[in-house]
Amino acid sequence: MAAASSVSSPPLCLAGRVAIVTGSSRGIGRAIAIHLAELGARVVVNYSTSPVEAEKVATAITTNCSKDAEVAGKSPRVIVVKADISEPSQVKSLFDEAERVFESPVHILVNSAAIADPNHSTISDMSVELFDRIISVNTRGAFICAREAANRLKRGGGGRIILLSTSLVQTLNTNYGSYTASKAAVEAMAKILAKELKGTEITVNCVSPGPVATEMFYTGLSNEIVEKVKSQNLFGRIGETKDIAPVVGFLASDAGEWINGQVIMANGGCLL
């Protein structure tokens, strides 16, 4: 019988691969960065405004992730890079730094960086300035990152572009107009890019989480609304970041190669 530790340890299916995870200093991005590292990837933890939190993620990866022989000698396992994904020059530098430090092309891009309206304004009440900022980070940023990845990811197998979306694109809840619009554009762009990358063996997919217990989710919501959201889920709870990270890990692995140009919904059954 195999030892218990061998059962609980994830296979190092991403050993030798380099992954950039934008917006990975906190929330879903943080969980994804740690999970990809657990699968053997060397990871770029990207942040824009949270350096302390980003360094904590890097420390968690360095301290807790496998020292297996498959990844031994490939040091460092993780680096922290500041970049505003809405700025093309900073995204280019993000990829440059990954290639320089890891001495390898990037294999995996996960675009998790995003912002939302903390006041949950209606479309009629939202300022143009806030709308522009949300589109700049969520849509323009996803475009800039995906464009850079399309030109620089390893071809011929193992290349993955994974963009985070939201179940709001399907539910069309009021008071989330700008955020929903920004992510609907990302889903359309991902499908088109998948077609444009035909023949490269680079896959492009979206992961569309339902409500997940993050700071961004809870901001501006009353306890009454949170309880209502829980009741709408078949599990009777809010999703957690650990529910989303393995979905991304699967898409990033060789096992997920046949999934391409898709929007994968991960919401515990709150949307059927």
Swiss-Prot record:
The keyword Chloroplast applies. This is NADPH-dependent aldehyde reductase 2, chloroplastic. NADP(+) binds at residues 26-50. Its EC number is 1.1.1.-. Pfam families: adh_short_C2. Its main location: plastid. Belongs to the short-chain dehydrogenases/reductases (SDR) family. The keyword Transit peptide applies. Substrate binds at residue 165. Residues 1-53 form a transit peptide. The lineage of its organism: Eukaryota, Viridiplantae, Streptophyta, Embryophyta, Tracheophyta. InterPro entries: NAD(P)-bd_dom_sf (IPR036291), SDR_fam (IPR002347). It comes from Arabidopsis thaliana (Mouse-ear cress). One of its GO terms (cellular component) is chloroplast. One of its GO terms (molecular function) is alcohol dehydrogenase (NADP+) activity. Keywords: Chloroplast, NADP, Oxidoreductase, Plastid, Transit peptide. Aldehyde reductase that catalyzes the reduction of the aldehyde carbonyl groups on saturated and alpha,beta-unsaturated aldehydes with more than 5 carbons. No activity on alpha,beta-unsaturated ketones. Can use propionaldehyde, butyraldehyde, methylglyoxal, (e)-2-pentenal, (E)-2-hexenal, (Z)-3-hexenal and (E)-2-nonenal as substrates, but not propenal (acrolein), crotonaldehyde, 2-butanone, 3-buten-2-one or 1-penten-3-one. Disulfide bonds: none annotated. The active site is at 179 (proton acceptor). It is found in: Plastid, Chloroplast.
